[in-house]
């Protein structure tokens, strides 16, 4: 895999992995098998790099959870820094339900930069066809954890809704909450443990 760097809007550079044509074809075939499995396990409010979902869908969900009279008043915004570069190979190998031999070869293939081969111990390259789906598999599950921990409960016959909702687009997300304290003291530590 060849490594190139493209400029980001903040002045930094983003590393991209450019697979060979053979690797691209193999990854496309692998993705045909992986994507249906990943879709059945995906968080309902995950919108990045998924079929039939877009930024518009993510924005509509944000609007839906934020405009009601009883909607949350606070938002925790998150961006998982270096998400693609820091994904655990072992987690992927343990949790992706397809052929591990091929997957491990891709993950450990390394990259070439300035005619020098560099090994890869973590991460999945941005630019790889299967990488966005692998990243989503790693990030899926947070919504389920939040929904279990912050479910609507009844106290003294009155519904108590903490208004905790997750909307994720790739490695960027927002989590809503009824109070700032709820987000800071309960949600944020949970997100930190998950990540």
Language-model segments: residues:
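Duplex nucleic acid-engaging cores and interfaces of nucleic-acid transaction enzymes
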Residues: 22-27, 59, 63
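Generic detector of ordered secondary-structure context
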Residues: 21-22, 54, 165
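Active/ligand-binding-proximal structured segments within catalytic/core domains
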Residues: 26-34, 134-135
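Conserved phosphate-binding loops in nucleotide/dinucleotide-binding enzymes
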Residues: 15-18
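Active-site beta-loop-alpha junctions of metal-dependent nucleic acid enzymes
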Residues: 51-57
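Charged boundary/loop elements
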Residues: 32, 36-48
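Conserved polymerase palm-domain catalytic core
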Residues: 3-4, 9, 44-45, 57-195
């Amino acid at each position: 895999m060849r490594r190139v760097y493209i400029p980001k809007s903040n002045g930094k550079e983003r590393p991209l992995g450019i697979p060979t044509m053979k690797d691209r074809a193999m990854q496309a075939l692998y993705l045909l098998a992986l994507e249906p499995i990943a879709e059945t396990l995906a968080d309902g409010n995950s919108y990045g790099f998924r079929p039939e979902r877009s930024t518009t869908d993510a924005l509509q969900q944000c609007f839906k959870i934020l405009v009601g009279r009883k909607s949350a008043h606070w938002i925790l915004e998150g961006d998982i820094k270096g998400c693609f570069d820091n994904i655990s190979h072992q987690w992927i190998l343990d949790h992706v339900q397809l052929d591990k031999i091929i997957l491990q070869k891709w993950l450990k293939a390394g990259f070439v930069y300035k005619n020098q081969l560099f090994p890869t111990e973590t991460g999945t390259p941005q630019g790889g066809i299967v990488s966005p789906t692998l990243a989503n598999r790693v990030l899926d599950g947070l919504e389920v954890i939040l929904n279990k921990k912050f479910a609507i409960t009844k106290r003294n016959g009155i519904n108590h809704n903490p208004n905790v909702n997750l909307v994720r687009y790739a490695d960027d997300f927002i989590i809503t909450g009824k109070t700032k304290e709820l987000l800071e003291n309960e949600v944020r530590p949970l997100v930190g443990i998950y990540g």
